[in-house]
Amino acid sequence: MSRLAVDSGQVLAEPKSNAEIVFKGRNVEIPDHFRIYVSQKLARLERFDRTIYLFDVELDHERNRRQRKSCQRVEITARGRGPVVRGEACADSFYAALESAVVKLESRLRRGKDRRKVHYGDKTPVSLAEATAVVPAPENGFNTRPAEAHDHDGAVVEREPGRIVRTKEHPAKPMSVDDALYQMELVGHDFFLFYDKDTERPSVVYRRHAYDYGLIRLA
């Protein structure tokens, strides 16, 4: 299990997030100073949605086979009364990945706030300058090692490619195709599985080339 190096002289004065933050590290130990830094970064995002009660922050050291180098991935999921909003990024360090993930999450939260304003009759979008200030990131980085798989006896086994490594379950709240496209954009995915309230069937919207979308329905 790897650890994060810390500069004892680093001082962070930003306020902490009011929402609960749940951290999950895959093959990396997340120290307290990094948790505090993340909390301070996320505190700036709560103004876009005051109903946010939980941030899920996941750090993962993965192997980028195309570039043949190690990749540090950070995924941040914001949960509130509205749709789930997510930002994720991959970089050569966890700090760099965090910065990119926060930028993506901020953009999607701002988009959701603008949509709510228009829906409730307030046509004035949030100012871009309001959210441009960023907190300088420490120069310290993670020292990581490739992920290892274990069998039931605890022995290390080599993980082969082409396997299902993650399974997720989501509530199937009926929604329109437009709402499904909106939620797909908020989580930053190329597809979105949903229950179509018009056809009462499971359906999938997906991103095509040239900013177009596709729709798959079960017969």
Curated annotation (Swiss-Prot):
It comes from the Bacteria. One of its GO terms (cellular component) is cytosolic small ribosomal subunit. InterPro entries: HPF/YfiA_ribosome-assoc (IPR050574), HPF_long/plastid (IPR034694), RHF-like (IPR036567), RHF/RaiA (IPR003489), Ribosom_S30AE_C (IPR032528), Ribosom_S30AE_C_sf (IPR038416). It is found in: Cytoplasm. GO terms for biological process: negative regulation of translational elongation. Keywords: Cytoplasm, Translation regulation. The keyword Transmembrane does not apply. One of its GO terms (molecular function) is ribosomal small subunit binding. Belongs to the HPF/YfiA ribosome-associated protein family. Long HPF subfamily. Required for dimerization of active 70S ribosomes into 100S ribosomes in stationary phase; 100S ribosomes are translationally inactive and sometimes present during exponential growth. Interacts with 100S ribosomes. HAMAP family: HPF. This is Ribosome hibernation promotion factor.
